[in-house]
A protein has these predicted regions:
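N-terminal amphipathic/basic-hydrophobic helices that include classical n-h-c signal peptides
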Residues: 1-8, 116
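Short hydrophobic helices that act as membrane-entry/anchoring signals
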Residues: 5-33
Length: 134
């Protein structure tokens, strides 16, 4: 019981710090966007403001371009194995986004991974309603 309480407190503290840092995280993306516009162009995706996806989704998250390249074999197999699903690949950087879009064009969907805050993640998951998450 005490362990559950401590885990709950840790998540609460983590979320509180996240909420306090959110303006700084957004400002950082806006500043980075001065040099690389892609950082600011889709900032609302990171806040969970995305359109509802009405088809079954398989969600694959790749932090880096290297992870994406390593995952292409898996993604290709998922496309073949689940023809009635759309694949959503999320990344955290514009270079990751560019790699996904160049490799798959419109064959898969791409979004930026959301900020790790409860209301953001809940909204994001509600909008994509994934059947499978990897």
């Amino acid at each position: 019981m005490r362990v559950l309480y401590l885990l709950s407190m840790n998540r609460t503290l983590y979320s509180l710090v996240g909420y306090l840092l959110l303006p700084i995280m957004v400002l950082r993306l806006l500043i980075k966007g001065l040099k690389t516009p892609a950082y600011r162009q889709r900032i609302f995706e990171r806040l969970g403001f995305i359109s509802k996806i009405p088809v079954p989704i398989i969600w694959v998250h790749c932090v880096s371009v290297g992870e994406f390249r390593a995952a292409t074999v898996l993604i290709d197999q998922l496309i073949k194995s689940y023809p009635d699903h759309r694949l959503l690949v999320t990344t955290t950087t514009p270079t990751g986004s560019q790699a996904v879009l160049e490799h798959y064009q419109s064959e898969v969907l791409h979004l930026y991974f959301p900020f790790d805050l409860p209301w953001v993640v809940n909204r994001y998951i509600k909008q994509i309603n994934p059947a499978i998450c990897l």
